[in-house]
Amino acid sequence: MSASDQGAVGEDATGEGTPWHCVVTGALGGIGAAVVTAAKNAGYRVTAVDQTPHGHSAGSDGDGQTGDGKRNGDVAVVGNIPADLPVDYVLDVTDAEAAQTTIDRIEADQGAIDVLIHTAGILRADAALDGDTDAMRASFEVNMFGAAHVCAPVAQRMCERKRGAIVVVSSNAGTTPRAGMGSYGASKAAITAWARNLGLECAPHGVRVNIVSPGSTDTPMLRGMWPAGEDRSADVIAGTPDQYRLGIPLQRLAQPEDIAGACLYLASDNARHIVMHDLRVDGGATLDS
């Protein structure tokens, strides 16, 4: 698909005929990195944001936030990342003040944000029956509050300019219960609901907010849940009836590029009349529940 097909080239937020400026959070993760690559290939000017300037954090779920939801060292650094590193700005999304400062800096340095694709998040495996409130707080700090710290101030700027698109990567676990994923599912349900409310409030200003909800995707996040050295893809595809988990009708895991394509579609002018939509990209795993 060409850049013009994706709507990545045209009048940007300044009214000039230049490539649109797309900011991607969680840019080092499996999905985030695929979004960065796809956006660049589609003709966007891309600004990559992650918690660490290179590689995955220790315990990372593959999208740049540590698996226990805690800060990983000096992560609230803003800007001035060496040019040879893949991340343009370093941000811990749980730090609201740093998020505001980073957004200010990005727009000052790179220009107004036309598109935001927020992929940052963590995955914790914990049972709701355990009532582990620490796990709940950790999941919500990143998956819910972290998204709000980034998306709300960007949306405010877009509303002032009367244009823009935001895509929030959530999960099909936000709408379909998963045994052993209590805090993760709850946090994703929360961000899905919040993003739809944000979309409702932004729509009168010409700003579109949508959600992409992946299913099982072949990323470090998913493989990090399996025993070391084991490939559990076949089990995921087949499903686990004893845990009331359906398999994947399409008989394959999603690839990060599948999720990236959905994100870019919703960000593009091809989706100009779509808002508050939750697009499932899970191979039919939730039977569209």
Predicted features along the sequence, with ranges:
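Residue(s) in the substrate-gating loop at a strand-loop-helix junction
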Residues: 171
